[in-house]
Structures are given as C-alpha cells and as structure tokens.
Amino acid sequence: MARSLKKGPFVADHLLKKIEYLNARREKQVITTWSRGSTIVPIMIGHTIAVYNGREHLPIFVTDQMVGHKLGEFSPTRTFRGHVKSDKKSRR
C-alpha cells in the first residue's frame, strides 16, 4: 500500500539535515547513510549519497529522474553469479 499524501515522503532526519547544511554552504561531498528506506526528494539532486548494501557503501549520484524512488533501489544487496552451465545432477 502506498504512503498517505498528507504524511509526505519519508526521509531520515539526519540525512535531510546533512543535505540542507551542504546546500546552504554550496558544498558537494559524499554523504554516507544506512537509510535505504529514505525517499529521494528534489533537494538531493546533484549530491552523491553512499548507500549501505550490507557489505559496503555504494556511491549514488542523484539525478532528477530518481526523485520519488527510494535510496535502496539503487544499491543492490545480492550478487547474482549466474547459473551453472553444465549441471548434470539437477537434471535427474
């Protein structure tokens, strides 16, 4: 179910404060966060946010097409190594 419009999008408070601080000083630096559930809002455009995927922080440069999506959508947590080409045991 979608989030109520009267509540607005969820953005972690600490992340929002960091971005507002950098926008006020007109600085660009990588912002490290564990908040994968935060929604990308228009004030984040142009910033690089390093999102934790369970093992490392993946840097994500936020563009205008990402607005409305969650930060976790852009840092995959699982690595797919492919299927085994000749696996005769699974055929039986």
Swiss-Prot record:
One of its GO terms (biological process) is ribosomal small subunit assembly. InterPro entries: Ribosomal_uS19, Ribosomal_uS19_bac-type, Ribosomal_uS19_CS, Ribosomal_uS19_SF. Disulfide bonds: none annotated. GO terms for molecular function: rRNA binding; structural constituent of ribosome. Keywords: Chloroplast, Plastid, Ribonucleoprotein, Ribosomal protein, RNA-binding, rRNA-binding. GO terms for cellular component: chloroplast; mitochondrial small ribosomal subunit. It holds the Pfam family Ribosomal_S19. Its main location: plastid. It is found in: Plastid, Chloroplast. Transmembrane segments: none annotated. HAMAP family: Ribosomal_uS19. Belongs to the universal ribosomal protein uS19 family. Protein S19 forms a complex with S13 that binds strongly to the 16S ribosomal RNA. NCBIfam families: rpsS_bact. PANTHER family: RIBOSOMAL PROTEIN S19P FAMILY MEMBER (PTHR11880), SMALL RIBOSOMAL SUBUNIT PROTEIN US19M (PTHR11880:SF8). This is Small ribosomal subunit protein uS19c. The lineage of its organism: Eukaryota, Viridiplantae, Streptophyta, Chlorokybophyceae, Chlorokybales. The gene is rps19.
